[in-house]
């Protein structure tokens, strides 16, 4: 890049600082051996001569003069010194509030660079620091200015940022002094008042609710004014939605002061008192609880900001379990949804200004939890980037009882961010003004480059991990220092009084006012004895189950949609083999009238889009499909250009997004869940490459998707597609662990399906789309096929799409209707049902005693349909549940109590399948085949 820049500019006036220093070093090499450097550089030096080295030449005059090698070396050394200060100055900064008086040896003495004060004074300031203030007149002053700039109570790391323009911008912002402009007295007074509120709230809780967990913010009080300022600056720039993710540390304070959750509601949660009569005291706030609820320091909130300063914006603090950092991709997904407009065909239109993600991390969790790296990896990806998130490490330098040296292998908690070229600011949490400078830097960088930025807010933890902890047990010296250390409010108030910004009387009046507001709020809280326990009841729409939904669609509409799905521009060159496959789909409505799985999916998507519902589908290889079945995105075989037929449906004004995801389950599933929660009108689907890999995202299934509504009242209609089925591919490519989803199934929290026909898949997708904005909506887990994608026994008649609807219980076709002869009912779900069907159809006679049915929807259990099936079979003797999974896996453990409970009197319920195993499947395909044959044979063979 340097050579190209030189060749284009051909003028020394444009070179300064490190660029000029580099040029001087190369020129020194050139004078010793002209052929030892790049030919382009040699040509440059031949034409322009030496780079400027004295004041006149550096100022742009055309005076000529020979430059000695020694002078070149001195200038190069001075420039290298300046670069070292920029790169390593943070090592000398005063960012640890508990070590503010620690004396540090001066880094980078002139002697280490072979320089004296006189020599460096002779070098122009602009050579060393182009953006220094005008009062900096020479190289020595420039070096001292850089030392002071890079070792304050705020320090900077951006040497890992590779983009030249970004580095130049970052350098200019820091060295011009723009970040450190004095704040107005009004703003400083407001920050003091906020810090007084933060401290007063925590101290009141500490006195009033002795020993109760609250995960105090004390030691990092500045986090609240930092959030205030990020929100205010962003909203002034046009942001209308701010999404915040954080763990429990300091959460109650953020809820009270950033989200405006009334003190009295928080107090009532400590008091375990009813709060239904408490009315928010400021702003407009919405807080939703589920029927089982959650602890107070996990709850989220929404707030509508309405004032002249910040215009109008919705602030959301996401609900969060104690699983640290897992909220991060959820917040980013919500932010992406808020940024996108989905009311036009094609991909959604993204406006990154509309919404901002703020992610608050812990200093132990940021390097410790892998989900952090997974989420950072999304930051520049087409389907996931949010125009830059602002990260804040709430760094109290300890994780529970574990100190930094035990919790990470890096110097800073923030070092992971370097791998993603995220600029980093370390700032002392005891210096609120430095914190405001960090905010200004972060907001302006994001606005300029639409990239992530990280603030490492370094403070301490005044008490233990929770308020029942005694931290001196494990950190006696640290907590001796903490006890002696004044609060940030005390430090800041003293500073402002000393500077004449406020008087001591003003400080006292602020304290009295804050104390009164808090105590007045407490008086509104009913006493604990008024609280009466009551039985938890499900909301009626949830307890009533899924309503019957008409998902049929007119045959002619389907035919037209199919034609549009196989239509592309004449000049577009579809890959030959794929073209033949796609063109065969036309026959579905002309000749054979059969629809295979992937066509049923495309038709479902097309019809849902035409109905006005946006769709977002992501996953590893989801554009093509893991098994080359989907091909939603066509690639021109000659130009590589892309074409998406679903973007070109006639009379469609709804967006369709499909994205290949990174190789990550957790962050991607979390992102899609967040997108869906924020955009409930959108059909959001996440597809695992194989269902086996879904457990890499287990936290999201356990803590959010299955339980989010019960805990927080947080509805979701997310669809999860998990390829599942035993085909001899070994223990890592066979099982989506359906047993885990069924174990989590309760209170109609989601739907779990294991389907065997294209029509069933078509209808369940359409049913989900039609339910999205209804109270009855819930997530949908589908065990999708692999080899069955092309199995002729899974294809459906077109009429099954146009005239039917989803059937939770699906009877085998071709059965005898002499129900009185039936003594065994074979029930199964998923791929093994097709294996049973194949074997059954090969039986020549002796089949009258058998009846076969598939349970397509496992949860909620279709008791009504199964009972109706039993009623048809008056002489039934046994019900066998057949599965290909081991007995301790699959659906058996879940379904056997249901079947036993509703089975007719005297009818046994039996199991046929693999025995109990620790591994889900055999590694040897031959052994697999024998086991599969045994299972199918046993299910269709009469006992002796």
UniProtKB/Swiss-Prot annotation:
Top EC group: oxidoreductase
EC number of this enzyme: 1.2.4.2
SUPFAM superfamilies: Thiamin diphosphate-binding fold (THDP-binding)
Functional note: E1 component of the 2-oxoglutarate dehydrogenase (OGDH) complex which catalyzes the decarboxylation of 2-oxoglutarate, the first step in the conversion of 2-oxoglutarate to succinyl-CoA and CO(2).
Bias (Basic and acidic residues) ranges: 925-936
Source species: Bacillus subtilis (strain 168)
GO biological process, alphabetically ordered: glycolytic process; tricarboxylic acid cycle
Family: Belongs to the alpha-ketoglutarate dehydrogenase family.
Self-association and partners: Homodimer. Part of the 2-oxoglutarate dehydrogenase (OGDH) complex composed of E1 (2-oxoglutarate dehydrogenase), E2 (dihydrolipoamide succinyltransferase) and E3 (dihydrolipoamide dehydrogenase); the complex contains multiple copies of the three enzymatic components (E1, E2 and E3).
InterPro entries recorded: 2oxoglutarate_DH_E1, 2oxoglutarate_DH_E1_bac, DH_E1, KGD_C_sf, ODO-1/KGD_C, THDP-binding, Transketolase-like_Pyr-bd
Chain residue ranges for the region called Disordered: 914-944
Protein's UniProt keywords contain Membrane: no
The name this protein goes by in its record: 2-oxoglutarate dehydrogenase E1 component
Any Gene Ontology CC annotation: oxoglutarate dehydrogenase complex
UniProt GO molecular function: oxoglutarate dehydrogenase (succinyl-transferring) activity; thiamine pyrophosphate binding
Named cofactor requirement(s): thiamine diphosphate
Keywords from the UniProt entry: Glycolysis, Oxidoreductase, Thiamine pyrophosphate
Top-rank taxon: Bacteria
Reaction(s) this enzyme catalyzes, per UniProt: N(6)-[(R)-lipoyl]-L-lysyl-[protein] + 2-oxoglutarate + H(+) = N(6)-[(R)-S(8)-succinyldihydrolipoyl]-L-lysyl-[protein] + CO2
Pfam family, one: Transket_pyr
């Amino acid at each position: 890049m340097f050579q190209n820049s030189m060749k284009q500019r051909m003028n020394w006036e444009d070179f300064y600082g490190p660029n000029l220093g580099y040029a001087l070093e190369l020129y020194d090499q050139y004078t010793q051996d002209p052929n030892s450097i790049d030919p382009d550089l040699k040509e440059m030096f031949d034409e322009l001569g030496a780079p400027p080295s004295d004041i006149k030449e550096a100022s742009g005059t055309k005076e000529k003069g020979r430059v000695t090698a020694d002078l070149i070396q001195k200038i190069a050394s001075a420039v290298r010194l300046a670069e070292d200060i920029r790169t390593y100055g943070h090592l000398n900064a005063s960012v640890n509030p508990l070590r503010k008086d620690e004396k540090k040896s001066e880094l980078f003495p002139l002697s280490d660079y072979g320089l004296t004060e006189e020599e460096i004074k002779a070098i122009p300031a602009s050579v060393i620091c182009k953006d220094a203030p005008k009062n900096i007149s020479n190289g020595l002053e420039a070096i001292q200015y850089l030392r002071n700039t890079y070792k304050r109570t705020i320090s900077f790391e951006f040497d890992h940022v590779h983009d030249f323009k970004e580095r130049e911008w970052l350098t200019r912002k820091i060295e011009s002094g723009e970040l450190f402009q004095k704040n107005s007295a009004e703003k400083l007074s407001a920050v003091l008042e906020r810090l007084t509120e933060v401290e007063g709230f925590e101290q009141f809780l500490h006195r009033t609710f002795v020993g109760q967990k609250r995960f105090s913010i004390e030691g990092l009080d500045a986090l609240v004014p930092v959030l205030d300022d990020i929100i205010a600056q962003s909203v002034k720039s046009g942001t209308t939605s701010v999404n915040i993710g954080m763990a429990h540390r300091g959460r109650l304070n953020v809820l009270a002061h950033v989200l405006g959750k009334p003190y009295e509601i928080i107090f009532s949660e400590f008091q375990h008192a009813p709060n239904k009569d408490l009315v928010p005291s400021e702003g407009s706030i919405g807080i939703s609880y589920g029927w089982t609820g959650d602890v107070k320091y996990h709850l989220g909130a929404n707030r509508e900001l309405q004032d002249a300063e910040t215009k109008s914006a919705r602030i959301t603090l996401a609900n969060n379990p104690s699983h640290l950092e897992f909220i991060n991709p959820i917040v980013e997904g919500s932010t992406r949804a808020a940024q996108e407009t989905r009311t036009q065909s094609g991909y959604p239109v993204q406006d990154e200004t509309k919404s901002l993600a703020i992610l608050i991390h812990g200093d132990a969790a940021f390097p410790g939890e892998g989900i952090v790296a997974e989420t950072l990896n999304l930051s520049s990806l087409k389907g996931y980037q949010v125009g830059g998130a602002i990260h804040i490490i709430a760094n109290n330098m300890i994780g529970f009882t574990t100190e930094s040296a035990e919790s990470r292998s890096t110097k800073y908690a923030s070092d992971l961010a370097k791998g993603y070229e995220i600029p980093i600011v370390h700032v002392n949490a005891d210096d609120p003004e430095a914190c405001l400078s960090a905010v200004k830097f972060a907001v302006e960088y994001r606005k300029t480059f639409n990239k992530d930025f990280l603030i490492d807010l370094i403070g301490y933890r005044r008490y233990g991990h929770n308020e029942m902890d005694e931290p001196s047990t494990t950190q006696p010296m640290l907590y001796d220092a903490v006890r002696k250390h004044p609060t940030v409010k005390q430090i800041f108030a003293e500073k402002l009084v000393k500077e004449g910004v406020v008087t001591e009387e003003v400080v006292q009046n602020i304290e009295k006012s804050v104390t009164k507001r808090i105590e007045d709020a407490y008086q509104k809280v009913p006493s604990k004895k008024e609280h009466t326990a009551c039985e938890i009841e499900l909301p009626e729409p949830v307890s009533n189950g899924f309503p019957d939904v008409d998902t049929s669609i007119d045959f002619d509409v389907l035919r037209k949609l199919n034609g549009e799905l196989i239509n592309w521009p004449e000049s577009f060159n579809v890959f030959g083999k794929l073209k033949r496959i796609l063109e065969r789909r036309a026959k579905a409505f002309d000749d054979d009238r059969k629809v295979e799985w992937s066509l049923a999916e495309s038709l479902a998507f097309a019809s849902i889009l035409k109905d006005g519902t946006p769709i977002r589908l992501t996953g590893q290889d989801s554009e093509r499909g893991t098994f080359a079945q989907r091909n939603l995105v066509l690639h021109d075989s000659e130009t590589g250009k892309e074409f998406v037929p679903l973007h070109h449906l006639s009379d469609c004004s709804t967006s369709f997004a499909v994205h290949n995801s990174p190789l990550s389950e957790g962050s991607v599933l979390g992102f899609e869940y967040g997108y869906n929660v924020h955009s409930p009108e959108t059909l959001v689907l996440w597809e695992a490459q194989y269902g086996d890999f879904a457990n890499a995202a287990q936290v999201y299934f356990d803590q959010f998707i299955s339980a989010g509504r019960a805990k927080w009242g947080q509805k979701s209609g997310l669809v999860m597609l998990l390829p599942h089925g035993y085909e001899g591919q070994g223990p890592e490519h066979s099982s989506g662990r359906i047993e885990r989803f069924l174990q989590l199934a309760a209170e109609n929290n989601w739907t779990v399906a294991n389907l065997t026909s294209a029509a069933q898949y078509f209808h369940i997708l359409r049913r989900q789309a039609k339910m999205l904005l209804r109270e009855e909506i819930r997530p949908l887990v589908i065990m999708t096929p692999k080899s069955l994608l092309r199995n002729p026994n899974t294809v459906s008649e077109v009429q099954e799409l146009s005239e039917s609807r989803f059937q939770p219980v699906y009877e085998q076709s071709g059965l005898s209707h002499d129900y009185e002869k039936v003594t065994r009912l074979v029930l199964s779900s998923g791929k093994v049902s097709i294996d049973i069907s194949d074997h059954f159809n090969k039986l020549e006679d002796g089949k009258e005693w058998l009846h076969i049915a598939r349970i397509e929807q496992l949860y909620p259990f279709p008791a009504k349909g199964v009972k109706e099936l039993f009623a048809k079979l008056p002489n039934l003797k046994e019900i066998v549940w057949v599965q290909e999974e081991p007995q301790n896996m699959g659906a058996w453990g879940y379904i056997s109590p249901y079947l036993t409970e509703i089975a007719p009197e005297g009818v046994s319920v039996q199991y046929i399948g693999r025995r109990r195993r620790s591994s889900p499947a055999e590694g040897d395909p031959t052994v697999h085949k024998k086991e599969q044959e045994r299972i199918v044979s046993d299910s269709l063979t009469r006992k002796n």
